[in-house]
């Protein structure tokens, strides 16, 4: 059994008032998994620009293996500003590289040899990456040992009921926090019950293991 673990989706720069730092939940997942000795990969896309060069350089310095395509779009960034109360505000740039991850023959081979993959909703806001993520999930061997982890990670308005349904149908592990559970319940039409009952409904409908997300 192959033991490759993949973090798939957005790889970007968080541009903070004090400077920029690398971001993207899938990349963070792959990095932390690698610290336990697993063979992990980051699957994403960056632009043919300085920001893309830096992302690849940072991953290389961390010893993190990647399958990141260069595409004719700018490398993703999130502009972070503080309002008058010091609360951070986020502007997630659209039309960027990780919105356009291609499904390649190399990616198909990786899917066939992947034990676990973590993906989210944000990277599916554009059709190109959404199709690639779904093809990757559908190409993975269909057996109980494979983990398809949907870190729902709702961001602004970058999700639809269709995206959420498709992802929950394909995953067998759902990572979700209380706030996201309330949002999902409203979208799917069962808001007036407690959180535990909401979890049981999701479990019965999608037959996924549900794990708590960050607050």
Can you say where each PLM-predicted feature lies in the sequence?
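Nucleotide phosphate-binding site architecture
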Residues: 13-14, 182
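Substrate-binding N-lobe of the ribokinase-like
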Residues: 4-5, 14-87, 94-101, 105
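Active-site beta-alpha turn of Rossmann-fold NAD(P)-dependent dehydrogenases/reductases
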Residues: 9
